[in-house]
Amino acid sequence: MSMPHIPASRGGVRIEHLVTSGTFSLDGGTWEVDNNVWLLATDTECLVIDVAHDAVAILDAVGDRRLVGVLCTHGHNDHINAVDAVRAATGAAAYLHPDDRMLWDVVTDRAPDADLAGGDRLTFGDVDLHVMHTPGHAPGACCFHAPALGVLFSGDTLFQGGPGATGRSFSDFPTIIASITSALFDLPDETVVLTGHGGATTIGAERPHLQDWLDRGH
């Protein structure tokens, strides 16, 4: 399947991307993982979605631009473990849904700077980000929809090939399916899904496979 087109920019706002590597730990297990770090950026400012593993690489990507905030799709360590170093270097605020505080608190003693809630609307330049609370992979999991760019930053809620994992603590398969069907599948087919791990997909590419996911149970 060909990769979906990622819009280059709108009103000077563009999407930038890097992959960082590290480990994910939960329930006594540890796994090596590669994570996507997404930036909404202009020439002078940027907003980071998920601060995974490598603060140096993330700060290099930010460069001399002002980091206006860090949005955390959820509280698993592999998505937030560079948060303190990035905050210390930039003074940027970190946003997290409060239902994931028990996961966050395993990683850092410093609280998030602000709460996310479903229905929130955040603005970066000419781009609005709609916060969608999509529990299932984690209780506080959130996706960020940028209608003007035609993209959804899905974290670990939706991937190419199905929903995020639900076999560990604080996760639930029926809940993630409800989040996807009641929120994400209402988006246009052409919406590009930029995921927390791996390649991009579209809503239209994933919607027809819902019954397959239900049949396999994950």
Regions found by a protein language model. Name each.
Residues 28-30, 113, 133-135:
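Short Gly/Pro-enriched turn/cap motifs at secondary-structure boundaries
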Residues 10-65, 143-154:
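Conserved beta-strand hairpin/beta-sheet module of binuclear metal-dependent hydrolase folds
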Residues 1-3:
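C-terminal regulatory/interaction regions
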Residues 46, 110, 128, 139-218:
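Metallo-beta-lactamase
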Residues 86, 122, 129-134, 144, ...:
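Hydrophobic packing within well-folded, soluble alpha/beta domains
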Residues 32-33, 46, 51-128, 208-216:
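Active-site HxH/HxHxD metal-binding segment of metal-dependent hydrolases
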Residues 39-40, 96, 123-124, 144-146, ...:
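Conserved hydrophobic "DFG−1" position in protein kinase catalytic cores
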Residues 70-80, 132-141, 194-200:
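Histidine-centered catalytic micro-motifs
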